[in-house]
Structures are given as structure tokens and as C-alpha cells.
Swiss-Prot record:
The gene is glmM. Binds 1 Mg(2+) ion per subunit. GO terms for molecular function: magnesium ion binding; phosphoglucosamine mutase activity; phosphomannomutase activity. Its EC number is 5.4.2.10. CDD domains: GlmM. The keyword Transmembrane helix does not apply. Disulfide bonds: none annotated. This is Phosphoglucosamine mutase.
Amino acid sequence: MKRSKYFGTDGIRGRVGLSPITPDFILKLGWAAGKVLSNYGSGRSKQVIIGKDTRISGYMLESALEAGLAASGLSAALTGPMPTPAIAYLTRTFRAEAGIVISASHNPFYDNGIKFFSIKGTKLDTQVEYFIETELNKCLKCIQPKLLGKAKRIIDAAGRYIEFCKGTFPAHLSLKKLRIVVDCANGATYHIAPNVLRELGADVIAISCNPNGININNKCGSTDIRRLRTQVLLKKADLGIAYDGDGDRVIMVDHIGNKVDGDQMLYILAKEYLYQRKLHGGIVGTWMSNMGLALALRELNIPFVRANVGDRSVLLMLREKGWYIGGENSGHIVLLDKTTTGDGIIVALQILSTMVSNSVSLYELCNNVYLLPQILINVYCSGFINPLESSVVKKEIQIIKQELSDQGRILLRQSGTEPYIRVMVEGKHYSKISYLANRIVSVIKGEMRSVN
């Protein structure tokens, strides 16, 4: 199958006002998706769940999607601002034909995107995405007036999802003795995560929970934990929890301000599942996963494999192997025994239940996993030229790999969601890998200048 024109690793994403994130394109996308999804759902409900994060552009894109779906004969059930995993859950429980999320995840407010979920609450198969793109190449033709779709609001969508999240936390446990700072990135979890934690008994200090349409992910959330760390120390909290704009990622901070990333959380979950005799097989990470995670899991005799970067790749490998737990160091973690996609709130609850049931701190849970220093630099790269194909860049990479030998790793890749080249260097000594990473960046930038 040829490469997708519009769909990336996580749906369709881009700058609002520029193709493809324009109201006219999104309207036609709704129509094309409606025509295809009606054939891949149950065919009975004729309903699609639509959720969004808190970006100001969400109103415009929601209306466009709604119109396009109606023109195809499908009705829209609107949730308002809701975490991405909540839409996956609601799609299943409402037996909808599909779920659609309007979000650009951890990106700034001026970006937005569209993600699709199947009737089972899973990411759409790439073949279905291809069929949608095929329909997009056709002229929009409205269905007969009497068959047009409608639109309605789902009553208490947030309450339904809150109860689902709480249901994944052991009924005999409570968070009453914990003080937790929660940073919702001014995003879709702002009215969900604090309430989940409070209803389970925690003393909650909520920050970045006042979205205004343009402050989503702005110096807050899982991509910038400086304010969270400050508040944890200032309020003498037991830990801090940070979500990204659409709630499918989570990063934590222990009581002394140490960052706890996705790799450390994977280790905590793997060890607890092993102890509870619930671990099926092993753990799926990605090529970005720290070598320290692999070594720590080896000590526990837990198998560890690496998938390509992206939750879709992690999910595919989990299903292929029949395993439950996988994720990325960015905090995007999947627990297939709990839900069908990455869910930051549910992952955090499993970490909290491990703390409470074992009467240990988050700091103590991380004691036996030692992450190697890792440098990640994003190099802006617009246009169609891929500097990673340059012979000059390839030669420099080979030289640096020889310098690192078996004492570290290098990973270079193009982002599937943003116009960046990701440069990752990992090794035992921070000063050395920082020097090597910046050498690579200099060569990449030099090649882009020479091409331009």
C-alpha cells in the first residue's frame, strides 16, 4: 500500500489554517470518513462520537466534522473537551460506528489534528485510513435530505469516564494519605483527573486547569514539568502528575522533585504485575527506550522488545505477542488489560495503587532502575528534503558510533507528527553524549543550509 498523503503516525495533524487543517478540508474529511466508517462499524447506530481538547480551533473543526458526517448520513454525538482515551472508551460503550478526537496532543495551541478510533476503541487500521483518503479524492456528494445525519450532546460523558477510571483502581485501597499535585496542561483532563483523584481520597492540588483556548501545553504539562516540580516541593506533596493536552501521556515527579518518565513507569508496572502474577509475557518499549530499562527488566527475567516509535507500533507488537504492557519514555503507556489505548489517568492510578499497596514512595519504586544519560534534540526540518539521507550525515553518524562503541546508542528519525528531526544520543557520560549530539545537529543543519 502506498504511503499515506494525509495520515501520519497519529492521525492527521498540522498548523490550523494551513492544509490539511482547514474547515473546508475537515468538512470533506468528515464526509469521506462517514462513508467509509459506516461500512466498518456495526452499521446499526449510525452514530460517531466526537471529542476534542481545549484548543480554540476545536470549535471550528468540530462544526466542520459534524457537517461532513451529516452529509454522509452519520450522526454526531458530541462530548465537548474530553481526553483522547475517554473517546476510545465511550466509542465502545455507546457501540458507535467510530470515535473521532480533535486534538494535536502535546503540540502548541496553533496546531490541531484529527484521530480516529474504530468501533472497538482501537486506532483505525491503516487500510481503513487508505479507504478514507480514496474517498477524499472524490467530489463531495450529499446524501438524500431525509437520510442526513443529526447532532446531539452526550449527557455526563465526563462522569461516565471518571467512573471507568476509578474502576481500574483496587476497591480496597484509598489515596487518603497522599497529597498530589496534578498538572493538566490546560488541556482535556482539566475537569477529569483532579476529580478522579479527589474521589479516591487524595488531597489534590490542581495546576494548569484553566484552559482559555490558547494556553494548552504552554509551559506546563508533561512536556514542561518545571512548575509541577516547584509546586511539589513547595506544597510538600508526596508526588506530582503531569498530563499532556489530550491526556494520553503522563509524566510524574517524586517528593524530592525527580522526574519519573515512561521508562521508569514501565519498570514499576512490570515489577508489580510480576509480583501480582498478572504479567503475560514481557514488555514492549521503543527504540527511544533507555538502555537502563532493558537492563533492569533483565534482572527480573522479564522479556523486553523494542518496537518502532509511536503508540500504533507499540500496540501492534503487543497484540502480535499477546502481551499487556508497552509504552514510550515520553509517558505514552498502554495497559491492554485495562483499556485499548494509551491512557495517562489510568496509568497514573496503577502507579498510585502500587505505592499504596506496598506502602512505599514513588522515589523508592524507582530505586532499581538506573537510566543512562540521554540527550534528545529536535532539529526543525521543513520541506521535502530529508537530511538523514545525506551521505555527509551518514558518514558522521558512523564515525560517532565508532567513538561510542558499546557504551551508548544513537537514534535519528523524522517525527511523524511535527516538522522535526529527532536526534537522540545515549551513553554513560553526559558531557560526552551532549558533545556528540550537538556534533550531529551541526552536520544536519549544515546539510540543510547547503540544500537550501
